[in-house]
């Protein structure tokens, strides 16, 4: 497999993870995530020991949805975790975990920084996704873009500074609210993927630095 193919595969994983944080799973998305091609993808991903438990939980949840009621329950989980700002939720915004303020505000420093990154890459948050730019879904989608359009050093710096710097805190909050749930598994898989990607990028960057 060429480096281009590897980077494309990495981008697909980041794009998938981004999509799961961006919106609830609807009927069309469920069909995509449980298709034959998707099953092969999940199977391949689960071969990595650090991903197995999370992938198995994700697959079993998706494959277990057989009616509208179960799909609505998963949508309710998404809404309760990510759209309602209470102590029983886990807001997916970097500023809430990186700011030193007692009550950090949305659209703050991390949002401005991420907006500038997007601007430099001639990208923008889509109008149908009215969220701050430091939303995890935006960051993961941007990383998917970097995989195919930027040097390894740029990718590594973004992952370490903008994603890995707060992801564990977010997941800790999420698992407290949603222990052993679908979105806890998605978040845990995201952290494991980011950690592995950093570990693979570091040697490559060290060689050329």
Curated annotation (Swiss-Prot):
Subcellular location: Cytoplasm
Highest rank taxon of the organism: Bacteria
InterPro entries recorded: Chaperone_TorD, DMSO/NO3_reduct_chaperone, HscB_C_sf, TorD-like_sf, TorD/DmsD_chaperones
The UniProt record lists the keyword Transferase: no
GO annotation (BP), single: protein complex oligomerization
Chief localization: cytoplasm
CC per GO annotation: cytoplasm
UniProt keyword rRNA-binding present: no
Transmembrane region(s): none
Key words of the record: Chaperone, Cytoplasm
Reported function: Involved in the biogenesis of TorA. Acts on TorA before the insertion of the molybdenum cofactor and, as a result, probably favors a conformation of the apoenzyme that is competent for acquiring the cofactor.
Similarity-based family: Belongs to the TorD/DmsD family. TorD subfamily.
NCBIfam families noted in UniProt: PRK04976.1
PANTHER family with a match to the protein in the record: CHAPERONE PROTEIN TORD (PTHR34227:SF11), CHAPERONE PROTEIN YCDY (PTHR34227)
Name of the featured protein: Chaperone protein TorD
Species assigned in the record: Shewanella baltica (strain OS155 / ATCC BAA-1091)
Lineage of the species this protein comes from: Bacteria, Pseudomonadati, Pseudomonadota, Gammaproteobacteria, Alteromonadales
């Amino acid at each position: 497999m060429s480096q281009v193919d590897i980077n494309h595969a990495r981008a697909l994983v980041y794009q998938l993870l981004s999509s799961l944080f961006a919106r609830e799973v609807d009927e069309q998305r469920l069909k995509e995530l449980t298709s034959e091609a998707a099953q092969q993808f999940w199977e391949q991903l689960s071969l990595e020991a650090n991903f197995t438990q999370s992938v198995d939980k994700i697959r079993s949840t998706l494959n277990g949805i057989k009616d509208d009621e179960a799909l609505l329950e998963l949508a309710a989980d998404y809404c309760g975790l990510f759209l309602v700002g209470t102590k029983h939720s886990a807001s997916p915004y970097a500023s809430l975990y990186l700011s030193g303020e007692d009550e950090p505000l949305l659209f703050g420093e991390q949002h401005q920084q991420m907006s500038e990154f997007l601007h430099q890459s001639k990208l923008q948050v889509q109008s149908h996704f009215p969220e701050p730019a430091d939303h995890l879904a935006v960051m993961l989608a941007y990383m998917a873009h970097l995989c195919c359009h930027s040097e390894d050093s740029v990718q590594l710096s973004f992952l370490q500074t903008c994603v890995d710097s707060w992801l564990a805190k977010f997941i800790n909050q999420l698992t407290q609210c949603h222990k052993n749930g679908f979105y806890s598994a998605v978040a845990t898989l995201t952290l494991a993927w980011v950690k592995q990607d950093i570990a693979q990028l570091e040697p490559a960057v060290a060689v050329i630095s």
